[in-house]
Amino acid sequence: MRRRLVCIAVILIVAVSAASAVSTDWFRNTLDADGKALYDKIGKAVLKCEECVPGVGYDSEECQRIYSGYLDDHPGIFWVEPGITYRTVTLGNRKTNSIVFNYTHQDNLAADQKTFVKLVDQFSRNLKQYDNDWIKLYHIFSYLSKTITYSLDYMDQSMWSVFFDGIGVCAGFARSFQYLALLEGIPSVVVHGWGREPDGTKGEPHLWVMAKIGDSWYHFDPTWGKYDDDNSIKYTYFCRSQKYMEQTHIIDMRYPIPAANDDTMSYASIRHRYIEKYSAEGFAKILADAVKRGDMTFTVEFSSLSEMTKAYQDLFVNRNFLNMIYQLDDAEILSYNHFEYEDSLSMKIIMI
């Protein structure tokens, strides 16, 4: 009896869902003709929830890369797990390799797709009031970093967990940011990599995202926008260059990304909270602006560790920060605290 590997459709989806229609072709365009052919087969199979793609001509690592790239281009596909099973079947002297997918939401996929679109719409429609892409991305970043709980105990890495459960890991944060950006017509791609350890080696695997404003691309890491000590937002990794990100991130170059060389649109630069060279006068202006805006918790970035050390010495060892507070008009500040983050060259100020 001849043995055949049969790929069956476990769920029939006649129409492409609105969630999967929000997409980019960035990764696909980096592939050669054979890679694009496999990418397209993966796409057709996933949209129909077919069990597998048979007869692939790549090894397991390259199949996983192309599959991951497909999910990167289609962040709204939440009903399939990010990992594949690579299956080899021997028929006589012939071996056939297949990609096997692992699906979720089998019982209520059509209903869950509608729920997903509705949940996303509840937030995305608020973005329509803004006509500036930087502001739109700022609100997306702020929403994810402030309201979504980060939990390594949560296994779902898709957007579903972020919008339905309010919980996610870095993949969910990145894909949600990308999806919302694409909805607004802002080009966006996912970045694969690792956190960088203090000794420069690879840390835990990590995903973040890039988006295009005008003619330039920028890095965003909404997962690292969450502070561990309270519920405030850290904009250190908002709208940054690759050079800046590589201080704390390592990029997996198996997944090509656009060049990003500009830091002039970072949150610190736009909000005038970046210090190239420390001076008491310059910091006093930043403090006065923060108090005027009502920002009782704010972050200042420095060009180097030495400049941040100078600021710490002057402000908190010599207690000049207290003198600055006394000089503010109508400022009722009873206490303050500060935290230094050497990895991101930033200082967080909390005033009460």
Regions found by a protein language model. Name each.
Residues Q106-D107, K146-Y150, G168-C170, G195-D199, ...:
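Solvent-exposed loop/turn segments at secondary-structure junctions
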Residues D107-V162:
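Secondary-structure boundary elements
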Residues R2-A21:
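Sec-dependent N-terminal signal peptides of Gram-positive bacterial secreted proteins and lipoproteins
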Residues R3, Q129, G166-V169:
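Membrane-interface junctions
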Residues M159-F173:
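A short, highly charged nucleic-acid-interacting micro-segment common to nuclease
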Residues S20-D131, E246-I352:
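N-terminal accessory/pre-domain segments preceding catalytic cores
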Residues G172-Y244:
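Hydrophobic/aromatic-rich core segments of domains that either
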